[in-house]
Amino acid sequence: MARLKDYYQKKLVAKLKTELGLDNIMEVPAIKKITLNMGVGDAAKDKKIMTFALNDLTAIAGQKPVVTKSKKSIAGFKIRDGWPIGAKVTLRGDRMYEFLDRLITIAIPRIRDFRGLSAKSFDGRGNYSLGMREQISFPEIDYDKVDSIRGLDISITTTAKNDDQGRALLKAFGFPFKS
């Protein structure tokens, strides 16, 4: 069992139940899934770029990503309908908790000029999104083999009913929010 999953079930559920004033432990917010997305606009020009992006995302997530394709042709961006323009992966279960553990303990502290996560990135329903400018913050990425610095979007979907419950859940997991 993943370390954070065990920690959530044994300690956080009881703590959050009293902190949020909930009656039933089934009301306690939990993390449903984590979605990682990497947009690769340059893939239209060079197919190798997409391969490098897929390899990076596979190393970070621990599972194979799905290639996202453009929905329609846009002349201004020089892309055609159906061309690969990115990759995404959805993590659930133990892999999700293991990724969350690596994100909180290793990747976020390695971000340059980091001053805390913005508390404004909640969507109104308790879900949180953050963007990372460099994929090299993750220890799985070998710095010498990186062809270019690429960012990625991380969306954390929770069962929280509002932003306050979502913030309390992520803060209990150890997310370093700005004060």
From Swiss-Prot:
Entry keyword Ribosomal protein: yes
UniProt cross-references to Pfam families, sorted A to Z: Ribosomal_L5, Ribosomal_L5_C
Molecular function GO labels: rRNA binding; structural constituent of ribosome; tRNA binding
Keywords (A to Z) from UniProt: Ribonucleoprotein, Ribosomal protein, RNA-binding, rRNA-binding, tRNA-binding
A GO cellular-component term linked to this record: ribosome
Any GO BP annotation: translation
The UniProt record lists the keyword Amino-acid biosynthesis: no
InterPro entries: Ribosomal_uL5, Ribosomal_uL5_bac-type, Ribosomal_uL5_C, Ribosomal_uL5_CS, Ribosomal_uL5_dom_sf, Ribosomal_uL5_N
Record text on subunit structure and interactions: Part of the 50S ribosomal subunit; part of the 5S rRNA/L5/L18/L25 subcomplex. Contacts the 5S rRNA and the P site tRNA. Forms a bridge to the 30S subunit in the 70S ribosome.
General function of this protein: This is one of the proteins that bind and probably mediate the attachment of the 5S RNA into the large ribosomal subunit, where it forms part of the central protuberance. In the 70S ribosome it contacts protein S13 of the 30S subunit (bridge B1b), connecting the 2 subunits; this bridge is implicated in subunit movement. Contacts the P site tRNA; the 5S rRNA and some of its associated proteins might help stabilize positioning of ribosome-bound tRNAs.
Family, similarity comment: Belongs to the universal ribosomal protein uL5 family.
Name under which the protein is recorded: Large ribosomal subunit protein uL5
Source species: Francisella tularensis subsp. mediasiatica (strain FSC147)
